[in-house]
């Protein structure tokens, strides 16, 4: 198992964390964080040659809503499979969910929807994500959608306003949805495409 306390964090500015202060009379004080996911340690292991790897671990995220969907402490399965494409990983995730589900709800019987962020922004918000590489266009689209954009707001925050208000609530709930190819402006531990302004990242 990788540590639950970390001196550094994954580059996910939208995730709020729990912090604590380590105190030692010989080495002084240092801030540590309860991990929001084991990603940073697991990717270090992969870089060191571990090969395919998985872990079931306790994770912690601050400022979460309390309920059936969100909780400040939760158990996460994180895995990385060497040689797998995004399509392979999505297929594996779907099969794992089917095999481990206690019941078989209708949404699990329906074929998953795999959609790129570019497609989702266009379909559910009418925003051209290629044109939105220009912040002026992105801001004007947010205003067209009647969203307030504060002065000096950055690209990621304006994008999230549109995504959280129009795209996420519009995604189908009768099947699994896999969002792929996140904008490269959103920092995360994922590779950039060489020919497109997106990162090789997907989320369910």
What is each residue range found by the language model?
Residues 90-100:
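Short amphipathic C-terminal alpha-helix that caps PH/PH-like domains
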Residues 99-204:
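Metal-assisted phosphate- and nucleotidyl-transfer catalytic regions
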Residues 81-88, 92, 107-116:
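Cytochrome P450
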